[in-house]
């Protein structure tokens, strides 16, 4: 499975599988219709990163470049078969 390296003081390895499953569980818990998952993930990626990092006890810093976020969204959409 893909590992995305997020820049912080040092690089944090983010498992696309773990993060995708975390998002999937959040969407299921909130009863978001599956046909809107793609847009919801794209629109709320910062929210999901923040929630995931809090759960992992990692300090969240929202200063991640847009290209990296696009790569992360694409990887999540692919993992969840939303493309």
List where the protein language model places each region.
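N-terminal acidic leader/helix
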Residues: 2-35
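Acidic, low-complexity, intrinsically disordered interaction modules
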Residues: 22-77
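Short acidic DE-rich linear segments
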Residues: 78-83
């Amino acid at each position: 499975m893909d590992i995305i390296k997020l820049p912080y003081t040092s690089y944090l390895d983010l498992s696309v599988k773990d993060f995708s499953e975390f998002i999937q569980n959040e969407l299921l818990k909130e009863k978001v219709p599956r046909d809107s998952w793609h847009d919801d993930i794209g629109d709320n990626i910062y929210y999901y990163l923040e929630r995931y990092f809090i759960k992992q006890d990692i300090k969240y810093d929202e200063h991640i470049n847009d290209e990296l976020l696009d790569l992360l969204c694409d990887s999540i959409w692919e993992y969840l078969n939303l493309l």
